[in-house]
Each structure stands twice: as C-alpha cells, then as structure tokens.
C-alpha cells in the first residue's frame, strides 16, 4: 500500500521436493539475503508464515535460480484493517431531555488515539447513538469521550480496543448518566418583631447540588419594600476560591447596581447598606453573582443580614422575605427558593376607665 519495507516477516524455504530448508526473517529493510547457498539452476519454493499487522500471502511461491545470477523475489502485503463502532445510550431517564433509559444518544464525541498516544480520528454519534470509524490499521487503540450528549454527564473512562483481524468491526457499548441540576438554600430569622426593630436573617445550605458546574450562579435576597429594609450585610465565606460581585436594588429603583465588587469568597465582608442613598431610599434586595461554580459549591460561614422594620406597621401584620439561589447549565436554568415570614406585634396600651366628672 505504501511501498515501505516490512521487517519481521517470516518465510519458510523449501527445495524442489518441497522439503523444508529453513525459516528466514526479513530485516529492517524488509529483505532476506541468501548468499552462496544455492548454486546452479534450480527450483525452490517459499511460503510466508507470519507477518504481524498484515494479511499473510497464502500458498507457495515458486523461485527459479540461475547459475551466476541474483534472483529477486518481491512480495506485497496488505495491512490488516478494521473499524470500531461505539453505541452510546442513556443510563437512566432524563427529566430534562425526555430520554428514557436505553435510548440512543446523539452528539457524543470520542477521540481515538493510537498506541503512541497520537490522535487518529474523532467519532460523533448519530441520532440513534451510533458512531463508526473509517478503516483503522492493525494494533491497539484507546478512545476517550471528549464531548457528552447535551444534559448527560461526560464519562472519564479510557476505552481500550484492538484491531486484530482484517475486516473486523469492534463493537463497544457505553452509557451516560443524566445530568442532575439542583441548587439549594435555606433561611431563618425572627418569627415575631415590633415595628421599628432591627432583626437578623441567616442564609445557609447555599449549594450547587448538581452533578455539573453551573454558570451565572447567584444568590438573591429580597425584602418587601413596604415592610422592611436592609441595613447591614455580612457576606459569609464559601468553599471555592472565586471573585464575586454584590449588587443591590432599592425601593426607589427597579434595576440592580453594584454594591461591592472584586470580593473574595474566603473572606467575610461587613457592608453598611445605608450609605450613599437618597433621603427615603432603602436597600430591599441583595444579589451575589459568582460566575461559574463547581460541583459541591457551598457556604463555609453563613451570610446574614440585619434589617429594620418600619415603625408604623400594625399589630398582626405579616411580611415574607425570600431568598433564591440558581444558575445555568447549557442554557438550562435551575433555581431553588426559600422564604421566611415574620409577624409584627404591637403592645396594646390599656387606657383604663376614665373617672366621671361634673355635678
């Protein structure tokens, strides 16, 4: 096929009576030299017996020698070639895509490497989950999944296979587990308070519980603008080294503005939320934006906020503040929410019975 010499090929030599004379092996140039062994005109036979990686030439080849002349015999071998076929299926039911367990998965990509670690080809599964290579030469190969089907987990397995026989197709079956997208957050605070009081809310179990990293990960705390406002924030710390930004929104604005940026997740910041505002303007919403967080992201020291309720809230009035944590994976949004309701109590002042006056 290439014209290159093949070393290590074994031949058996026979005399005219087809009695074995010996076994000979080609050198690095693909040649066997038999000097001064054969004199005169004669007939010999050679048979190729072993040729790793190539299709062995079958049958006896006739060689006729002549006195005083060099006889050349040249043989060509076709390489052993085969293919690899991968079938990728769902390991479980996928709530996002609707795939059922056993369904074929499209767009899984596999990179095939030879025994020296050199890239040979890239395979991509079709709508039924199948991908098949072109012809591969005899030898050992490995294959790695480099892109998983959408909303399925990428496998870290190195798949080994070998082409041994000409024309064979090595069939491989593999599964992908579904991507689980889940976040979590909880909050706690005062169940009752008085109007004009300062109260504290804690945020905890802030987690990326997905099996994949999430982009645009955020934490959003919101108070009802007619009941309370945020006065002070303690940021907490988190278990992954990231820089993040905190935004705020007030009772006077409908959009978020930067409160503090270039914050470090391993440091607690105390932030005064009353400075730089107009008269009668108060912060009602705080939003952390972390960018991309890895699997298992969570707080180490819990964040908490101090809030002040408005003075004139009536007895029995209830207000609910909410927290939301979320992110995105491959354009799929995920979020979790929690809330906490606080009730206002106001002491009832008993005036007593006024005495009668007059005549």
Identify the residue ranges that each predicted region occupies.
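Solvent-exposed loop/turn and edge beta-strand elements of beta-rich ligand-binding domains
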Residues: 1-359
């Amino acid at each position: 096929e290439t014209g290159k010499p093949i070393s290590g090929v074994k031949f058996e030599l026979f005399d005219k009576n087809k009695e074995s004379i010996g076994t000979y092996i080609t050198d690095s140039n693909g040649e066997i030299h038999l000097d001064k062994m054969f004199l005169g005109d004669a007939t010999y036979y050679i048979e190729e017996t072993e040729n790793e990686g190539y299709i062995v030439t079958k049958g006896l080849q006739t060689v006729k020698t002549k006195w005083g002349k060099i006889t050349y015999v040249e043989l060509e071998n076709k390489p052993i070639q085969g293919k690899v076929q991968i079938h990728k299926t769902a390991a479980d039911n996928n709530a996002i895509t609707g795939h059922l367990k056993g369904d074929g998965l499209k767009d899984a990509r596999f990179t095939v490497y030879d025994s020296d670690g050199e890239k040979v080809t890239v395979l991509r599964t079709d709508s039924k989950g199948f991908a098949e290579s072109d012809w591969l030469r005899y030898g050992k190969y490995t294959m790695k999944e480099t892109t998983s089907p959408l909303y399925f987990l990428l496998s870290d397995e190195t798949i080994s296979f070998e082409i041994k026989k000409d024309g064979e197709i090595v069939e491989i079956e593999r599964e992908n587990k579904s991507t689980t997208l889940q976040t979590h957050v909880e909050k706690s605070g005062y169940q009752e308070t008085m109007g004009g009081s300062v109260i504290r809310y804690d945020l905890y179990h802030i987690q990326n519980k997905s099996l994949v990293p999430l982009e645009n990960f955020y934490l959003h705390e919101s108070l009802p603008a007619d009941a309370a406002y945020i006065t002070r924030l303690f940021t907490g710390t988190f278990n992954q080294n990231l820089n993040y930004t905190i935004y705020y929104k007030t009772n006077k604005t409908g959009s978020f503005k930067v409160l503090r940026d270039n914050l470090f997740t391993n440091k607690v910041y105390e932030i005064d939320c009353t400075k730089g505002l107009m008269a009668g303007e108060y912060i009602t919403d705080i939003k952390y934006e972390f960018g991309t967080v890895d699997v298992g992201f969570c707080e180490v020291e819990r964040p908490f906020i101090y809030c002040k309720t408005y003075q004139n809230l009536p007895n029995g009035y209830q207000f609910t503040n909410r927290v939301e944590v979320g992110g995105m994976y491959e354009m799929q949004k995920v979020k979790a929410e929690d809330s906490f309701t606080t009730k206002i109590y106001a002491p009832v002042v008993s005036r007593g019975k006024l005495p009668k006056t007059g005549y």
